[in-house]
């Protein structure tokens, strides 16, 4: 298709210009800002170095090394983001200490240039503290050391080194990483290619390099100060090395480079072939000067091509020169022509604005050397070409001159039929000029592998007495000396056989030679040095037979000679040799009587190694298994476990020790049991060994596989001694390996750990659940810094901490860390503790759970004593945290080091200056909040995170706004009403969230991944991401990323049910199969049938009633909301309405229900005879543990943890206060729902202490009542609808329904009802003090609302622990005392509601006085049918659900504003519909409801269809905004 006609379209041009402008704006907005002043050459160099990246120059700084520092800052940003904040930094520059966080910093003693840097270092924050400590000679501290990276042993998994390892070789770095137990290290190095050249001076447009015999000096272009000096050999090692092998393997990978500045990722793992080209874009060729400076006489001396000087030549110049010389005619080829052509192409040529030739400006000597090198190279190529052609022609002549039969014979004898090139006539040597006169680093490939430093110490320093890398044997994960075979020779008076082996330990104080230890291999030079050093007294030997089974030689027998009783021990620090008889085949036997051999135990007092069965026991598990410290190969057990590999080949570590001790066990054979990690082989030996390969955690963590391996191992008959399988080179956590072993360990089984792991096992594994508290040491310097922070606290917080001072102290704490949503705060017991939170939002959440929560400034001022809980400890400023804990006795901290740390809002740098170094005492890795996709995304930050959530995909990029809005900056918070920042959201949980990333948060998100972690881990179900500017794309939060995560997630299958599934009950005949109906149609029909009009008012506050008794406490302001907004099914409701949010409505309810005078009769009523009519066999009972368990289950179901239950003290308000809450009426009515003139309803909650005291008793009494009721009685809800339906269906014909509903039932109860309750409690055996306490609390009480209070007496409160029980009992007592029922068949009682199906009913004469004296208000009626507790009673027809009442109550509810309320509506309708349908009473229900209310059957069918529509989530909701009419007088 031809689109040329659109090329000149204005719209197309405009669109292209707009797109280009947008791209330019985006590039400039995201560009790297370059702040130093630069020369023109430096600017060009930076643009070329950062090719592909946008730079924006905003000069404002004067730097000595501007180009290098810009490169340094770029690589530093990448490295710190990759390493995270809790890393170890090697050789940190003083200016970076206050800006960046690190767990530890390693320095060398400041000398020379370092001394200058520390003298001019910043005089504030942590940098100033370290500067003063270094200059005062402090060697080691928590935050730093000046031992150097190679000598320090601070434990840290990740490290960084920014231009600080130019003096350490890769092998030494590998050993240092092992000492630090470091797995990953990011190393930034300056590695110029000129370091690979011989001594000389080399220049390019970026820098000048001067190579001396051992130094490499680099000075960058236009720099104003001295350059950099490095060791050439070290630079060459870093350039050529890609891996370190040996005991401390390391893999080196180049992950980023800017020019010759590299970021090397050093990983502690086995190296693999990784050939690489370090300078793939080098545009320089180095040409050799064949003359050579100061060489011997003669051009072709052997070293002329090795030590010659090289000149850098632009690649384009050299390629053009070689092309010209190669293509010249033989007659025209000469050196002068090459020199003339070289001079010509070295001249810059410009044609207009086009540079035709960039030019080159060489020196005279350089020009001559290049021309000569080119001439010699072309000469050599021409000679090779001539020789090749001549030999080829002779070969062709010979081939064509062959006879026929010779050709046939050659055809059958030659295997190859395709002729190749014959180059056998010439072979080049490396020292020849013909071997090449140029070095081209663009084509150089390096893949060198060296051995770690501790492996080569004996070869480099043969006189050294020991090795720096000495750790426990045999696991060797932290760096053990290389052990080699070295037979003992002459030099001692001992006659030891040649095949004995020695072991050297430089730190030992044992005998010079001791053969009582297992056979080990040793260092050659150290052994020789130890043997040459003669002790003052003959050494004593103890030779132990360690020969293989079946060795025919006699065991060595050492006869003890007469020696002096006091041998002189070797001086401490000298090497000590331990020798063990080897398994070699040759060598003379040791004679039975040797004068130089003396039993060690009889002569010396030196300590001996632990003997078999005498190892140190760390712990004994309940199963009888033991954890011991010792050598696995010497443990007395039936079976020894060898942590083998999958191929069962002799390896390193403990597996290698098994092979060296018992080589006859290989090849492995025996009983095999296959596992996914590899076959487990039971070998009979001797000794009996179980070869058990564990899972490789370097590939994938597999706790289940580890448990399976231990389970198979512990199936062996007899005791089993195991190591921590997979905890060595396979990198499994020691905790997981221990837990897997402990899960299946039996009585007598052993877990053998080495000495260096003992403390780790004791602290973090064996003491799980009772972690040893850590200590926070506050020295004088830290206390001064804390006091400085408190004194300079900004307004308005300075008034809170005014006068607070902190002295040096030590605080013991336990820090529970874990992944987001792991239940850190919900699992801690906050009873009696003060909770310190960083934000008010978090404090309110703690207060809602019943805790005493304060913010850090309040805590610093109050200094709480006793138990203190610190939530989100890492987010609290350290000086406030220290000040808050100065009086605390028991401190529990909660937090996550990967989330947002304490922020330095006011720029005082106190966060970095006061480094508390908090270390977790326990880690939790199971999240109960985060969905699966979020967990997978966070695996880089939390490698072992898992979740119990069932949500697979939760993060969406649809642009919708749902749930709580979370932003990153205060500006964005002001632009998005209702939103909160990530700092405020930290520690909170929401069902749905919306993350809004604005452009002003780019720097915050790019510099701190913790902010994104907090934002992504706040939701349970769904998270909508709105990222218009692509801010979150930089950290990988994209739709494509989460789509890939969703594809990777394995959807778990539902677990099989424990029992047999029961199908839903089959419905009986009577189903109408009515389809769902429109809810708005049902609402209109219901309004017409009942006669209710659409609402014009949300509620009416009637005039307040008169306070007849009690004392009322009123707030200063009686305000409330003037309008109500609800999302409802209709604008017409059928429930009595009130205004629960109005303060006047609350006071009206308090006074109307509990402020009226209570009538107290002058006569006493004995109602026990009345109770005997329905309650028989009242006698003493005791609540069992079942009632207490039911109480605990009820508390847990409501989210309570029992922390609100306190000691019984009536003077304590928490123990005696009754709390009042106003609630919606939601009472279905056929009268006017608004102008009803009645007060609202409320809930009175008793304190949890009294509920826990009386609750189990009342529950036991209730069970006794229900169990003893006569036939036909139905109590509360403790029956099934089917039983009630059957009883009503079987009622005799002609029976009537008597129903009664008390008015003001609670407020009319007085001393008569209370005395009755107390009398029943006494007869059931309740202690007298409890009865008296109940009578006291019920008689005189204080009802406390949020802002109001009422002090009164008598009455009944709905929140009492026995509300339903005693209200129902009082209801039954009054009805049986006032009325007499003839032939009752069904009697239902629940609270103040009651229904009796009987033949007739008449009033008792004695009941009139009870009603009058107690002021009872009874609303009774008798008819052919009645209503009871949302049920309609029709004698002879049965019991059906009240459809119209259910629909009317739904119209009053507010089903907004979130999706959760709509789901509640759907679930409620589903339950109601299922309740009707499963009983097969759909037709009966519709008919009886229509008959009860006197409406059309069709209308009830539409209501039934509307309920079905709501159950199917097909309802229609309307928003009603209505005013509240206030008729009360506020004065």
Swiss-Prot record:
Residues 622-786 are annotated as: X-domain. Keywords: ATP-binding, Helicase, Host cytoplasm, Hydrolase, Magnesium, Metal-binding, Methyltransferase, Nucleotide-binding, Nucleotidyltransferase, Protease, RNA-binding, RNA-directed RNA polymerase, Thiol protease, Transferase, Viral RNA replication, Zinc. Residues 803-1046 are annotated as: NTPase/helicase. Residues 561-600 are annotated as: Disordered. Residues 56-239 form the Alphavirus-like MT domain. Residues 612-761 form the Macro domain. Its EC number is 2.1.1.-, 2.7.7.-, 3.4.-.-, 3.6.4.-. Residues 240-434 are annotated as: Y-domain. Residues 591-600 have a biased composition (Polar residues). The keyword Protease applies. Residues 925-1058 form the (+)RNA virus helicase C-terminal domain. One of its GO terms (biological process) is mRNA modification. ATP binds at residues 818-825. Residues 786-924 form the (+)RNA virus helicase ATP-binding domain. It catalyses: RNA(n) + a ribonucleoside 5'-triphosphate = RNA(n+1) + diphosphate; GTP + S-adenosyl-L-methionine = N(7)-methyl-GTP + S-adenosyl-L-homocysteine. GO terms for molecular function: ATP binding; cysteine-type peptidase activity; helicase activity; metal ion binding; mRNA methyltransferase activity; RNA binding; RNA-directed RNA polymerase activity. GO terms for cellular component: host cell perinuclear region of cytoplasm. Residues 1049-1531 are annotated as: RNA-directed RNA polymerase. Methyltransferase: Displays a capping enzyme activity. This function is necessary since all viral RNAs are synthesized in the cytoplasm, and host capping enzymes are restricted to the nucleus. The enzymatic reaction involves a covalent link between 7-methyl-GMP and the methyltransferase, whereas eukaryotic capping enzymes form a covalent complex only with GMP. Methyltransferase catalyzes transfer of a methyl group from S-adenosylmethionine to GTP and GDP to yield m(7)GTP or m(7)GDP. Belongs to the hepevirus non-structural polyprotein family. The protease domain interacts with host EIF2AK4 (via C-terminus); this interaction inhibits dimerization of EIF2AK4 and prevents EIF2AK4-mediated phosphorylation of host EIF2A. This is Non-structural polyprotein pORF1. It comes from Avian hepatitis E virus (isolate Chicken/California/Meng) (AHEV). The lineage of its organism: Viruses, Riboviria, Orthornavirae, Kitrinoviricota, Alsuviricetes.
